[in-house]
From Swiss-Prot:
UniProt-recorded name of the protein: Biotin synthase
Pathway the protein takes part in: Cofactor biosynthesis; biotin biosynthesis; biotin from 7,8-diaminononanoate: step 2/2
Job description of the protein: Catalyzes the conversion of dethiobiotin (DTB) to biotin by the insertion of a sulfur atom into dethiobiotin via a radical-based mechanism.
InterPro entries in alphabetical order: Aldolase_TIM, BATS_dom, Biotin_synth/BioAB, Biotin_synthase, Elp3/MiaA/NifB-like_rSAM, rSAM
Organism: Shewanella woodyi (strain ATCC 51908 / MS32)
Domain of life: Bacteria
Cofactor requirement: [4Fe-4S] cluster; [2Fe-2S] cluster
Gene3D superfamilies (alphabetical): Aldolase class I
Binding site for [2Fe-2S] cluster: 100, 131, 191, 263
Keyword 4Fe-4S appears in the UniProt entry: yes
Cell cycle as UniProt keyword: no
Subunit-level organization: Homodimer.
Lineage: Bacteria, Pseudomonadati, Pseudomonadota, Gammaproteobacteria, Alteromonadales
Record key words, sorted: 2Fe-2S, 4Fe-4S, Biotin biosynthesis, Iron, Iron-sulfur, Metal-binding, S-adenosyl-L-methionine, Transferase
UniProt gene name: bioB
């Protein structure tokens, strides 16, 4: 098999041509590349905690954490460090290798930085990788977090540059690119992806992946989120995205960015086991683990581990999460999969989802 060539000069029409391939051809190409770089049966597991919820001043149309929309979400202040550590211990015990902390901010304030750095240091002392998503970062803030030991910083591009203005007006596309540049310059790893199912056109999905793949250095982690339509947000009544379009997006991301972790992110709660299996085959090799993604639902741990067992997958580093390996748990997960099999629907990505 030929050696994989990393490219940073993808043209839009080249990417659109990949999306247009017959499904079997696309999946074959993506999976072949995936096998060359990664163990195809290993999935990296992260746990995500909202450390500050709601009252965000931004106007992202998909997000229930925006103060501009009445979604019934109760806002919370920055939580105490000990609560963060309790959640991190639980995550590690359940098999997560990375702990992600998200805050619904436009950007962190100077008064927040000491607490954030302490969170990073304490979680790292447990032997876990750390990730944060706090909004925009200045070069100095990125440097402070890097010095504290933060491994990853998430800041998504959300969609293509052309469609971006229809999604958010309070932060520019260049603002997002600048934050990613600050993160990379500080020596941290970049986590950046986007959301599909927001009413975008096919060319916008190509445009999003083009932006990511043409960065000077590919993101280390690329989360692909499916919109979860939340009542009270402007996007609550959008039509569902075809599940196979989502699978195609995963596959094209794997082809364009062979060495990046492609994360099957928000939206798994509404995906059938069969759809998730196709995503793993297409090149997804990272998930969020636990019953919540910031403010939205996520499959329970035992359901994920039951699915892993059925598919012959294992968590990164070969560490299995705790699972009640009994008939009742298996039957519960199977029943849920059957119940939603014919109800494929879009799922939601939060403002700080990774």
């Amino acid at each position: 098999m030929s050696e994989i060539q990393l490219r940073h000069d993808w043209k839009r029409d080249e990417i659109e041509a990949l999306f247009a391939l017959p499904m079997n051809d696309l999946l074959f190409e993506a999976h072949s590349i995936h096998r060359q770089v990664y163990d195809p049966n290993e999935v990296q597991i992260s746990r995500l905690l909202s450390i500050k919820t709601g009252a965000c001043p931004e106007d992202c149309k998909y997000c229930p954490q925006s103060a501009r929309y009445d979604t019934g979400l109760e806002k919370e202040r920055l939580i105490e460090i000990e609560k963060v550590l309790t959640e991190a211990r639980s995550a590690k015990a359940a098999g997560a290798s990375r702990f992600c902390m998200g805050a619904a901010w436009r950007n962190p304030h100077a008064r927040d930085m000491p607490y954030l750095k302490d969170m990073v240091r304490e979680v790292k002392s447990m032997g876990m990788e750390t990730c944060m998503t706090l909004g925009m970062l200045s070069p100095d803030q990125a440097g402070e977090l890097a010095e504290a030991g933060l491994d990853y910083y998430n800041h998504n591009l959300d969609t293509s540059p052309e469609y971006y203005g229809d999604i958010i007006t309070t932060r520019t596309y260049q603002d997002r690119l600048d934050t990613l540049s600050n993160v990379r310059a500080a020596g941290m790893k970049v986590c950046s992806g986007g959301i599909v199912g927001m009413g975008e056109q096919a060319t916008d999905r190509s445009g999003l992946l083009q932006q990511l793949a043409n960065m000077e250095q590919h993101p280390d982690s690329v989360p692909i989120n499916m919109l979860v339509k939340v009542a009270g947000t402007p996007f609550e009544n959008l039509e569902d995205l075809d599940p196979l379009v989502f699978v195609r997006t995963i596959a094209v991301a794997r082809i364009l960015m062979p060495h990046s972790r492609v994360r099957l992110s928000a939206g798994r709660e509404k995906m059938s086991d069969e759809m998730q299996a196709m995503c793993f085959f297409a090149g997804a090799n990272s998930i969020f683990y636990g019953c919540k993604l910031l403010t939205t639902n996520n499959p329970e741990e035992n359901e994920d581990m039951t699915l892993f067992k059925r598919l012959g997958l294992h968590p990164e580093q070969g560490k299995y999460a705790t699972i009640e390996d009994d008939k009742a748990v298996f039957e519960k997960a199977t029943a849920k999969a059957n119940a939603i099999k014919d109800k494929q629907s879009s799922a939601f990505y939060d403002a700080a989802a990774l």
